[in-house]
Amino acid sequence: MGKEKIHISIVVIGHVDSGKSTTTGHLIYKLGGIDKRVIERFEKEAAEMNKRSFKYAWVLDKLKAERERGITIDIALWKFETTKYSCTVIDAPGHRDFIKNMITGTSQADCAVLIIDSTTGVFQAGISKDGQTREHALLAFTLGVKQMICCCNKMDATTPKYSKSRYDEIVKEVSSYLKKVGYNPDKVPFVPISGFEGDNMIERSSNLDWYKGPTLLEALDQINEPKRPSDKPLHLPLQDVYKIGGIGTVPVGRVETGVIKPGMVVTFGPTGLTTEVKSVEVHHESLLEALPGDNVGFNVKNVAVKDLKRGYVASNSKDDPAKEAANFTAQVIIMNHPGQISNGYAPVLDCHTSHIAVKFAEIQTKIDRRSGKELEAAPKFLKNGDAGFVKMIPTKPMVVETFAQYPPLGRFAVRDMRQTVAVGVIKSVEKKEPTGAKVTKAAIKKK
């Protein structure tokens, strides 16, 4: 085994019928970690059900079905390898909670792969005013996914087959709306593919010999290496807190920024509880330090389980410790809200691992969501498609940060009526100083 490949996360976006599952399934099938025996079993079942047409999509269908039945699937199934990278596919959209997952998601995507159905009629629907494609692209950009690869899929089904003029038409149209969203289309490779037949997915296709650019695999290899935020101060949102016999209290979560190591003194926001980290574990192995992206459990001394909750944030007590937000200002984009949102609206915010009702205290401005220019000061309300700056006040103690400083703690989904009705990016936070916070003996000793 050579040196471990760099890990990157990819989010696959596009209209429901664009062939996302087939394309993703194809990559995982050809380059992934799915056991041959599992594939044979799937193939046999697919054949029995006459599902041959879904040549690769069933790979994903099976994975999704198993996940929905609560069978935790080995995450390796959602991985595939390029020459340079080990790629993880983030929850393929189309899923009802996709938007929420993309925001609070356990991972920030390094690159978005936009799949477009090149056949006539369908392409127009996917990109029309209310098209999902546009919404997904806007969402990806707003949430800081700065790199994009665009696949013109189903080239085997254009009229005539593998039509260059069709491809050119799509490149022109998609470029213009990617530009409106905020991407630079000159930096976006447009790869003509067939996820079904396999053209230009991994090997070059003679059917598309008019195309001289990279295959999908090559385009993935050309993604810029992401910078990981290990040099920022520690911020680790808690997912759970366990009491483990013989060890004690073990909070669990994903390191978003910075590093955590044994011997460190940590402060938990929003309460300000401060204690020493005794040990750090990843997959039951003790580590000397854990880095951004690692899911860790860490043992803390003299702390009761009831003193910590999901949504609290562990931080370095000597370096920008996490504090309660008194209020914060965010740029909010309204997505699927049926009515009008005005001052006093109090939906639930999902931000990192916290899930707390927050009041829209003051809608300060309405802005053009593409240029950021102010359209109206102190508007009476915001409705679907609008964007604006809003001052928000949490109804319970919560930790948030600015998107610029700590991206995973600075983006949120607004949930109401069992769906995501808006997304936001935090621009500024006013913090409260903790009062009467408990500092354990272990922490005092370390001071």
Swiss-Prot record:
One of its GO terms (molecular function) is translation elongation factor activity. The keyword Phosphoprotein applies. The modification 5-glutamyl glycerylphosphorylethanolamine is found at residues 289, 362. Residues 5-230 form the tr-type G domain. Residues 91-94 are annotated as: G3. The modification N6,N6-dimethyllysine is found at residue 55. One of its GO terms (cellular component) is cytoplasm. Keywords: Cytoplasm, Elongation factor, GTP-binding, Methylation, Nucleotide-binding, Phosphoprotein, Protein biosynthesis. Residues 14-21 are annotated as: G1. GTP binds at residues 14-21, 91-95, 153-156. Residues 153-156 are annotated as: G4. The keyword Nucleotide-binding applies. Its main location: cytoplasm. The modification N6,N6,N6-trimethyllysine is found at residues 79, 187, 306, 396. The modification N6-methyllysine is found at residue 261. Residues 70-74 are annotated as: G2. It is found in: Cytoplasm. This protein promotes the GTP-dependent binding of aminoacyl-tRNA to the A-site of ribosomes during protein biosynthesis. Belongs to the TRAFAC class translation factor GTPase superfamily. Classic translation factor GTPase family. EF-Tu/EF-1A subfamily. NCBIfam families: EF-1_alpha, PRK12317.1. This is Elongation factor 1-alpha. The lineage of its organism: Eukaryota, Viridiplantae, Streptophyta, Embryophyta, Tracheophyta.
